[in-house]
């Protein structure tokens, strides 16, 4: 189980990303379409003025069952240990153990 403070930090980051998503997208579109270097510099400063944790690249995928940050399968939102455990119990529909 991950530390509760780390899970809370990621939840906080997720909220910030959602809150600033439209503003960040608008600024990035302006930045990419701007031709004048001084205009690009000004837009870049505006992007940098946004909260650091509002960038989507700072979010971390975590297992929803345990909060572990590594070995998380995107399709299920579970870490590898939980995925194996729940698949063996038959709690994941459509998942079968491989055999050849």
UniProtKB/Swiss-Prot annotation:
Question: What are the alphabetically sorted keywords of the record?
Answer: Ribonucleoprotein, Ribosomal protein, RNA-binding, rRNA-binding
Q: Name one GO biological process term.
A: translation
InterPro entries linked to this entry: Ribosomal_uS14, Ribosomal_uS14_bac/plastid, Ribosomal_uS14_CS
Which domain of life does the UniProt lineage start with? Bacteria
Single GO term (MF): structural constituent of ribosome
Q: Name one GO cellular component term.
A: small ribosomal subunit
Query: Tell me, how does this one assemble?
Result: Part of the 30S ribosomal subunit. Contacts proteins S3 and S10.
Family stated for the protein in its record: Belongs to the universal ribosomal protein uS14 family.
What this protein is reported to do is described as:
Binds 16S rRNA, required for the assembly of 30S particles and may also be responsible for determining the conformation of the 16S rRNA at the A site.
The protein, known as: Small ribosomal subunit protein uS14
Organism of derivation:
Prochlorococcus marinus (strain MIT 9211)
Upper taxonomic lineage: Bacteria, Bacillati, Cyanobacteriota, Cyanophyceae, Synechococcales
Gene behind this protein = rpsN
